[in-house]
């Protein structure tokens, strides 16, 4: 199993707009081989730096399936307009990928 996450620092006050982008997106993830599930996670508010931490979390059968998704036309189509949402978050999303430890 493979977990792919992107962490976003969402500008304080923009949380609902950020969530709406995800809720209203056209997703083709379920069409991709190896895709299991998606979750958008809301983390803590950092008052000092004025952002709320969010993470997009996808679960895949394997890292190979995830990489195939990133090279697919579906991936390109789903990220085509992502730049228009940059005012909602600080900096670039930070990617983290994890492979499950079998038997643990």
Language model: regions and residue ranges:
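Short amphipathic alpha-helical/adjacent loop interface patches that line ligand
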Residues: 22, 26
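Flexible, low-complexity linkers/stalks enriched in Thr/Pro that connect modular domains
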Residues: 41, 96-103
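An amphipathic, aromatic/His-enriched active-site/gating alpha helix that lines ligand/cofactor pockets
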Residues: 27-36, 51, 59-96
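Acidic pyrophosphate-coordinating catalytic loop
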Residues: 44-50
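Residue-level preference for beta-strand/loop junctions
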Residues: 2, 50-52
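Short hydrophobic/aromatic beta-strand micro-patches
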Residues: 9, 41, 57-59
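Short, surface-exposed ligand-recognition loops at beta-strand->loop->(often short) alpha-helix junctions
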Residues: 10-18
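Active-site-flanking beta-strand signature of metal-NTP-handling nucleotidyl enzymes
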Residues: 3-8
């Amino acid at each position: 199993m493979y977990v792919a996450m992107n962490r976003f620092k969402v500008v304080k006050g923009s949380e609902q707009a950020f969530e709406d982008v995800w809720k209203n997106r056209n997703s083709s993830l379920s069409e991709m081989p190896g895709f299991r599930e998606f979750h958008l996670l809301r983390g803590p508010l950092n008052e000092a730096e004025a952002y709320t931490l969010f993470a997009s979390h996808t679960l895949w059968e394997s890292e190979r399936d995830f990489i195939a998704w990133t090279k697919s036309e579906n991936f390109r189509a789903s990220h085509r307009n992502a730049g228009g949402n940059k005012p909602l978050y600080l900096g670039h999303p930070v990617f983290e990928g994890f492979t499950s430890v079998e038997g643990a």
